[in-house]
Amino acid sequence: MTKKLSPLEKKNRKPASKACVFCHSKHLQCSNERPCKNCMKRNLGDQCHDAIRKRAKYLNTSGVKKMKSRTNSISSSYRSPSVSESPQNPYTHSIIKQEPDLNMRGELQSIQQENTSHNQPGPSNVSHYVDQRPTIPTNTMLDTTNDVLNKLLYSEPIHSDSISLRDSISEQPEMDSNRRSIDTMFNSNYLNQEYLMLGDIILHSKPSSPSPSNTSASEYNGDATISPANTLLNNTRLDFDNSNDHMSNSKRKLNKLKDSRPFIALGVSNDVPISLQPEGTLSLDNLSTKNEIMNKDNISSNSLKTDYVSPLISHHIYQSVQDIYMHSIPNFDYPQSYHSLTNFLKRRFSGNSLAHDQRQAKRNNLLIILKLIASYRPTFISAHKNLLKPYDLLFLEMSFQRSLIDYEKLLLFNSSPSIIWRRTGEIVSISNDLLSILGFNLSEILSKRTFIMELMYDDESIINYFKLFKSVAVGNLHSSIITKCKLMKNSSAAFHNEASDVADREYIEFCSAWTVKRDPFDIPMLIIGQFLPILPGGEGVRKY
């Protein structure tokens, strides 16, 4: 244990200008003489010498700049064919120009190897040096941020189909100077991410209709995309059938990819057909192999049936678990289902025949519902953006049909009236008890696209439905909900056995309990609702 010093000793002692190795490692107060007192006490006098300090970074800038200029002169005088094409390839150029700090260690090691070698560096040696540089993955987020900034601040997007090779080479230095001035604008990845989203909205996003559901029409379609920029990515499939057009096609497609960027997704999307290597060098063998794989996926996705199949037909096809694996499962088009839901809500809340105040109240209710849908739909889209299409989509639909068969068997042993619907609200199963209570038959509900909201009588029940579904759609894993709602009766059906006041009304009030079944991605797949009617009190009538 270190001896406790008196106040006089503390006052008289002077700190050493440099500590020895032992005192520096043990964080002890060292003295100026060598060997110091601490080393003498521990019989380490022969090992006592000054600790070597690291040189400050600001003192190394001049030496690093000289080494950088030397390496740049060597690489410019002797350049391999893959690097000489960098003005045409934006990804190679971004590595050489934008990331000197990341590649500095590799440059210093290369300079040391060059100084120790006896041979004079020739063109073959330097090309080997350039090719053997350590590959460090580039920050593609920063690269695309610079592209967005260049578009917003300096010039319009450059389309490679409308310019020649000479024009693209002449315009590259100007783009590089603009890019260098913007490199250090944002040091935060989150800030760059925000700016990328804003840039995509400004440059690319043009919704086809004011409906919020149209902004995300690609939840499950392999060919649909979230933004028009993804359409450009899907259109840039490389064709390697003719060997003479390999390099020209790759250059043209890469230039087209430079001015495009999809919205942010969870992981790397499998829709992108080519691999952009950090050095910008394209391996034709790898690209042709990947192109064949993607062509097979495109064929399978195009052959995937997306036509609407009513739940009534599905019940006749998939009557057992064996039928699910024996028959081909058509892909359920969730975006189209959301569009149909939006059209129904617009018709339901139009209020054309009502007074101005009532029509305005209807529109306000519609706005509330659309905001609730827009709050959870982007999460569904982003969670399914990285699915392997069409195989994951088939797996999810098979899981849905498999769960539906199990729950329908369970409802046969349950005496309460029940409805099963998808997360879009589309009804896929309804019990005979509830059909008899409401006065509908099975074909009226399941032979077409019918939403659970269509059976609700008042606007308050519909708004309450979307509020409750929003509470369990994202984040909250509580899988049961208890609420009240009013379901309308069939106006053409006759009710003779009910109480007089119930028969006169156009609706029946129910106490409802929901059970939410989630898919493997923790997104609601189907909802099982049990509805118990609330009947008026009286003799011989049970009230729930």
UniProtKB/Swiss-Prot annotation:
Superkingdom as given in the UniProt entry: Eukaryota
Residue ranges the UniProt entry marks as DNA-binding: 20-48
Biased composition (Low complexity): 70-86
Disulfide bridge partners, by residue number: none
GO MF term (any one): RNA polymerase II transcription regulatory region sequence-specific DNA binding
InterPro entries, per the entry: ERT1_acuK_gluconeogen_tf (IPR050335), PAS_13 (IPR056751), Zn2-C6_fun-type_DNA-bd_sf (IPR036864), Zn2Cys6_DnaBD (IPR001138)
Any single Pfam family the record assigns to this protein: Zn_clus
Keywords: DNA-binding, Metal-binding, Nucleus, Transcription, Transcription regulation, Zinc
Residue ranges constituting the PAS domain according to the UniProt record: 403-475
Localization terms from the record: Nucleus
Keyword field contains Glycoprotein: no
GO BP annotation list: cellular response to starvation
TM ranges: none
Biological function: Transcription factor which regulates nonfermentable carbon utilization.
Protein family (similarity comment): Belongs to the ERT1/acuK family.
Name of the protein: Glucose starvation modulator protein 1
Organism: Debaryomyces hansenii (strain ATCC 36239 / CBS 767 / BCRC 21394 / JCM 1990 / NBRC 0083 / IGC 2968) (Yeast)
Primary gene name: GSM1
